[in-house]
Amino acid sequence: MVRAFVLYESEPDAARYEQHAELCRKVPGSTFRHGRVFGAPMGEPKFKYYAEWEFADMDAFKAAARTDEFMATGKDAMEMGVPFHVHFAQVD
């Protein structure tokens, strides 16, 4: 399984983020989730919001990453104006 996850430095505007989430749900071969970060073990969390896609395997991730839908999500995320960090993980 492969996950692509995004950590946002601040919480995006809810209505604007729902528009973004609609784009994210269109990425083929993936399950999309998102939510507000509410805490950390010690002190305030560094990130305020997260999103993730889950793909069955590396081939599914690579295929999805080449789609117009996936590319549109990156462009749209940048247009929201909230700083974010993208990471990829292979889950055993």
What is each model feature region?
Residues 1-68, 86-92:
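Short S/T/G/P-rich N-terminal loop/turn motif that feeds into the first structured element of a domain
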Residues 70-79, 83-84:
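Outer-membrane beta-barrel domain signature
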